[in-house]
Amino acid sequence: MNRRVVVPTLLVCAAPWLGGCQATDAIVDYFGPHADPTLTSLAHDASADAHALQKLDPDAASLRAQHADELYSEIERLCGRDEEGHVPRSCEVNREGEAHEATDAAAVLAAASSSTKEQLDAVSPESRPLLVAQAIAMEARSTDEPGAVPELTEDDADLATELLDWEYQQVYALDFARSYVTPDVEELVDERLALHENRVLALQEAVAKIGPVPQPAAAYTSSSGELPVDADSARAFLDYVAHSDTVTWTSAASQEVPDQAAPNAEWRSWLISVAAQSHRISAA
């Protein structure tokens, strides 16, 4: 984290080699905290995207404007504030991004998501969840589905196994709910079941390459404490299951592996893609 202590005015004025307090700003600018360059670059890109997308896709423009605001706020949070609540002069940034033209909103968001993911390891760990959330939000607007699970390392084994167990639970929950839904909802449940079963197969195949594959339990309980008992509760349960899936995969994509020599960028990118898929389902 790029924090430094701002030199107190009293000490600056007392220094014999300075020509009075007029040098304070220059000293603070030099010794004070500075904006994270990666966050600044991403914020400028988001601002430029928002401007370029205004007429092409107002919703996408709004999303990128939100991202810019979040990134500038993160820059200020990392820099800290003085006793009067102001960000140090040394941390002030120009909020004007370099303008560019856009003809395809999906391409703009895809490029922005890719750039965001590439910069994840260039920012401090405490800023990564924000970048992950932004990448997920952009990919959630796409219709692209996650590809095959990339090759896992031993460091990824625990999380992959946990997610496989989670997918077992999702399949059980949806299968249970299907017994109570009305006929017009059965197709929706079947679509979601197929999606989660595909995730199960993909994770089983990936986990099998690095260790034993855990098998599903005979039954699972709901973390909400309640399972469906009729059509109304089944419909509400489906919403709960979709929301829980979004939370779980978003958390997984943001998770840091302790003592990992080098992050598995492809695995993290896949987790972001699955989280985005879950967001699309939950919003549908």
Predicted regions located by residue number:
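N-terminal export and membrane-targeting signals
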Residues: 1-11
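C-terminal motif of bacterial Sec signal peptides marking the signal peptidase cleavage site
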Residues: 17-20
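All-alpha RGS (Regulator of G-protein Signaling) helical domain and cognate RGS-like helical scaffolds
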Residues: 22-284
